[in-house]
Amino acid sequence: MKILIFIIASFMLIGVECKEGYPMGRNGCKIPCAINDNICKVECQAKWKQSDGYCYSWGLSCYCTNLLEDAEVWDSSNNKCVG
């Protein structure tokens, strides 16, 4: 029985995914970048210590990975960008 519980728990852990998204600046807009991953990595880690970041070339904006579920990221449905 313990083995069965262990196997089920293992499958649940394998499927765990972290939140991802665009970090927002003070004005509510995405943080712009131009092919420089270091800037984005610094921005993401300044807001969320455990995160990683890179410059998403298609959108020319920083993109953060490994975020906590309650992390506030830019969302097109409730865009508050004023810049």
Swiss-Prot record:
Disulfide bonds: C29-C81, C33-C55, C40-C62, C44-C64
InterPro entries membership: LCN-type_CS_alpha_beta_dom (IPR044062), Scorpion_toxin-like_sf (IPR036574), Scorpion_toxinL (IPR018218), Scorpion_toxinL/defensin (IPR002061)
Organism: Rhopalurus junceus (Caribbean blue scorpion)
Domain LCN-type CS-alpha/beta: 19-82
Predominant subcellular localization, coarse grouping: secreted
Name this protein carries in UniProt: Putative beta-neurotoxin RjAa15f
Function: Beta toxins bind voltage-independently at site-4 of sodium channels (Nav) and shift the voltage of activation toward more negative potentials thereby affecting sodium channel activation and promoting spontaneous and repetitive firing.
Localization, UniProt: Secreted
Tissue: Expressed by the venom gland.
GO cellular component: extracellular region
The keyword Manganese is assigned to this record: no
Record-linked PROSITE patterns: LCN_CSAB
Swiss-Prot/TrEMBL domain comment: Has the structural arrangement of an alpha-helix connected to antiparallel beta-sheets by disulfide bonds (CS-alpha/beta).
Keywords: Disulfide bond, Ion channel impairing toxin, Neurotoxin, Secreted, Signal, Toxin, Voltage-gated sodium channel impairing toxin
Signal peptide segment: 1-18
CDD domains: neurotoxins_LC_scorpion (cd23106)
MF GO annotations: sodium channel inhibitor activity; toxin activity
Protein family (similarity comment): Belongs to the long (4 C-C) scorpion toxin superfamily. Sodium channel inhibitor family. Beta subfamily.
Keyword field contains Signal: yes
